[in-house]
Amino acid sequence: MYKDRDVNQRDSRFENQQDGFKKNSNFRFFKRKSCKFCDSGKHPDYKEFDFLKKFITEQGKILPKRITGTSAKHQRRLALEIKRARYMALLPFVKK
């Protein structure tokens, strides 16, 4: 039914797939960061600008939730409070 050459080609393709799986086996799973606000029960506040500085890069950009580990609800609130603190001149818009 199958020629010998066809069977060998299929085996070589299967071996290549196994090599591909071995490459992906080095993938590491990271522990999900917990939200600092959910754990402590605190809410972000624009008056606590020293605490808000932890969520801003050196250029003054707001860090995303995948880096900070905050929940979606608190990330939205955090962005709002950072923008309020910027407007009140407690935090800089852009760092020089």
UniProtKB/Swiss-Prot annotation:
Keyword Cell membrane: no
GO cellular component: cytosolic small ribosomal subunit
Top-level taxon of the source organism: Bacteria
Stored Pfam families: Ribosomal_S18
Organism: Borreliella afzelii (strain PKo) (Borrelia afzelii)
Gene giving rise to this polypeptide: rpsR
Function noted in UniProt: Binds as a heterodimer with protein bS6 to the central domain of the 16S rRNA, where it helps stabilize the platform of the 30S subunit.
Assembly description: Part of the 30S ribosomal subunit. Forms a tight heterodimer with protein bS6.
Name of this chain's protein: Small ribosomal subunit protein bS18
